[in-house]
Design a protein with these regions (language model features):
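Formylglycine-dependent sulfatase
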Residues: 8, 15-467, 477-498, 525-554
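Bacterial N-terminal signal peptides that target proteins for export
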Residues: 1-12
Length: 554
């Protein structure tokens, strides 16, 4: 072959290699993962029933209308740090080691951004991080810990070691500052020759809810609809674990909106946290319990929804920019909250419980190139599945250490594979911390939920009464009728218990992490008559301890 021919052939081959590489890059979509803190499905128009007419989320609703909306997406532990750890590792908390708010994920174990970078993506993390260790992204600008709503401060890259490089924005609101930072990254940092993987994480609407003053008038003259269970729950609801023997623990299990819980309630928090706004004394005997609960509920919902409105308005800014830059339709956009949240149902606040209001995550995925608009799916998705989905869209192999599984085919067809999971696993470890929630675990299928309140801390101590609850989600989607002891559900109960025990092993929760806690779990698993009598005794003992603690506090 002549030299000129060899040169020409080499140029052609090089051009083909280069062209094929560019094609592969162009075929890979950008990925934008948006997560708000405590944004529950009940407060999104695409999901909401009670609050739908308030229309707090037109931008998110439009995203849902253009993609797929999942009705059965769940976190495996309804608390901020563990949920985020599941998403960045694809592992359950008992595997990645983040059981509670004190957990952290080492840089070398931050699997999702590491693999995205290896796949040729430019990676960025902006907003709430809450995993303590330095983020392993090409770019990061993250809140310290939980962060503040105003005078936003970020930890950034710089000459000093993590976490000493800090930038502050006096007078800013976090939702605005986080969005400003994301838009600045797109305008100043994005490499147009690479696909991007951006995690944009709002602090809002985490409590205590503080919105920008421009939202003060939003809903000011509106009476927010109240869930019926805010006021009363049937006698069939709950168990000795959540009510106590003869209802003796109703004041002490789960923090409240109204005065029910004397240790912590939103009614008591309002004048303490917002003294200029709420000058009334909730202990005033001239204010009835009904009046106080109604005042507290209206404040709780309005403050929360104003934060949600700030999130939605800022998302419009981001989506408008992506459209202007012709990036919107070439980007897989995922919207979620890190867990659900109580909006007054059952007179509970915060999250943490295995009940759907706090365990369910909103989950919306839009990518018009392969996902049709207006799809809804009842497939069971867990937050450990999120990173596998994103890696799948990026063309990466899913590593064996990830316990989650990609649900891309469900996004693109609306159909579950024959071998798709039929149950979600849940475990909350922070027994009686912050919001008075007992240690619990559950299995949830599409039709039933079985919850085991084992009721102890990591050392098997500070016990609350153990009990089981079973809910028929088809007949009782609000989980108000515990059918665990009803004869007609005995077969369902026994079958679910066997499935539950197997699921624990399948996900790696074998109890070896905290053996003393596991001894309690096993001790009351069968829940025979002797166990029930011991649970009554534990209920009495806990009530006495709690009443003594409250007396000492006074």
């Amino acid at each position: 072959m002549k030299r000129s021919a060899r040169i020409f052939l080499g140029l052609v081959c090089g051009w083909l290699v280069t062209f094929s590489g560019v094609a592969r890059s162009e075929d890979r979509p950008n990925i934008l993962f948006i997560m708000s803190d405590d944004h529950t499905a009940q407060a999104i128009g695409a999901y909401a029933t009670l609050l739908k007419e308030l229309d707090p989320t037109p931008t998110i609703d439009a995203l849902a209308a253009d993609g797929i909306c999942f009705d059965n997406a769940f976190c495996t532990n309804s608390i901020c740090t563990p949920s985020r750890a599941c998403i960045i590792t694809g592992q359950y908390d008992h595997v990645n080691g983040v059981f509670d708010l004190g957990g952290r994920i080492a840089r070398e174990k931050q699997t999702l951004p590491i693999l995205m970078r290896a796949q040729g993506y430019q990676t960025a993390m902006i907003g709430k991080w809450h995993l303590k260790v330095e983020p392993n992204y090409d770019f990061y600008k993250v809140l310290p810990g939980q962060g503040k709503y105003f005078d936003t401060e970020f930890r950034i890259q710089g000459v000093k070691p993590w976490p000493k490089n800090v930038v502050k924005y006096p007078g800013s609101h976090s939702s605005d500052a986080i969005m400003d930072s994301t838009l600045a990254w797109f305008k100043e940092q994005r490499n147009p020759d690479k696909p991007f993987f951006v995690c944009h994480h709002f602090k809002a609407p985490h409590d205590y809810f503080e919105s920008h003053p421009r939202y003060d008038s939003y809903l000011a003259d509106v009476d927010i609809p109240e869930p019926a269970s805010l006021w009363e729950k049937p006698d069939t609801w709950g168990s000795v674990a959540t009510r106590g023997y003869q209802d003796e623990l109703i004041p002490h299990i789960g923090t409240s909106i109204g005065r029910r819980n004397p240790r912590r309630s939103y009614a008591a928090d309002l004048p303490r946290v917002f003294p200029d706004e709420f000058k009334w004394d909730y202990r005033n005997p001239n204010l009835t319990d009904v009046v106080v609960k109604r005042l507290a509920y209206q404040a709780y919902l309005k403050k929360y929804l104003r934060c949600v409105k700030g999130v939605d308005d800022n998302l419009k800014r981001l989506f408008d920019y992506l459209k202007e830059e012709n990036l919107f339709d070439n980007t897989v956009i995922i919207y979620t909250g890190d867990q659900g949240f109580w909006l007054g149902e059952k007179d509970y606040q915060d999250k943490r419980w295995a009940y759907d209001e706090s365990a369910r995550m909103p989950l919306i995925v839009r990518y018009p190139k392969t996902i049709s608009s207006g799809i809804r799916s009842d497939a069971i998705i867990e937050n450990v599945d999120f990173p596998a989905l994103m890696l799948d869209f990026a063309g990466a192999e899913i590593p064996s250490q990830m316990q989650g599984r990609s649900f891309r085919s469900i996004c693109e067809t609306g159909i579950e594979p024959d071998d798709w999971k039929q149950a979600a696993y849940y475990r909350y470890w922070m027994h009686m911390a912050h919001h008075d929630n007992p240690g619990e675990m559950s299995i949830r299928t599409k039709n039933h939920k079985l919850i085991y309140f084992y009721g102890c801390d990591y050392q098997g101590e500070k016990q609350t009464p153990p009990a089981w609850e079973l809910y028929d989600l088809v007949k009782d989607p609000r989980e108000l009728n515990n059918v665990y002891d009803q004869p007609e559900y005995r077969e369902v109960r026994d079958r679910l218990k066997v499935q539950f025990a197997k699921l624990r092993l399948d996900v790696g929760d074998d109890g070896s992490h905290y053996p003393a806690c596991e001894r309690i779990v096993q001790e009351f698993w069968d829940y025979d008559e002797a166990d029930r009598q011991r649970a009554i005794k534990i209920s009495n003992q806990f009530r006495q301890r709690r009443e003594a603690e409250l007396a000492d506090r006074k």
